[in-house]
Amino acid sequence: MHRYEEQTSYLVGFIYVHRISDIRVGGTSKRNLKMFQRICGTDSFKNVTVVTTMWDKVTSEEGEGREQELKQSDVLFKPLMDGGATMARHDGTREPALKIMQWFSDKNDTVVAKIVDELVKEKKNILDTEAGKELQSDLRNVLQKHQKNLQALEDEIREAKQQGDKNVEEEAAVDRRKVLEDIAKVKWEFEKLRNTSSKKFRCVSSFVLCNWF
């Protein structure tokens, strides 16, 4: 394993996989994409390949239409494409997979992931990196949503008590307990992020970049 304090980890590129069969792209997928962009950094977009899969689940017309929508959407892949990223299709067979790997092997330039550059060269704290800020923002948004739901349920319980409606009160109380559990989980994620050492985070981020994206 590299010693990241002394040696920067260089990569040939990054792969982001997306199902072309997805009719719409949900909030979770958009957040994952944004996090991917923060980890890579705009300077590395030229070394990104967006691989679309599940082409056997759509007609050629449907797939090509969605492909164009993905390329042209500002909240999806347009920022990557504008930065020099490429898009490739994978139909589940061996040939397109080999072509994608060949594209990477033919590249002469290497890149350093933004997250690695921030932690190693700039000596930033995890929370001050672009990816760290993005994750904190996501966690805050989720926490605010849960807290809003909690307030609504507490209002519902209070109103049910005033009206003597035991069924509504009990159902709302069950939902309230679930929301409190969700809030506790988000707060735990916050604490875990704050307590993660920079060295450990560098190792994890490098592993993720090499094995997941």
What is the meaning of each model-derived region?
Residues 6-9, 43-46, 56-213:
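C-terminal non-catalytic interaction/localization modules
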Residues 30-31, 36-37, 125, 132:
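Mixed-charge, polar/low-complexity N-terminal
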Residues 1-24, 33-43, 49:
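Inter-motif core of Ras-like GTPase G domains
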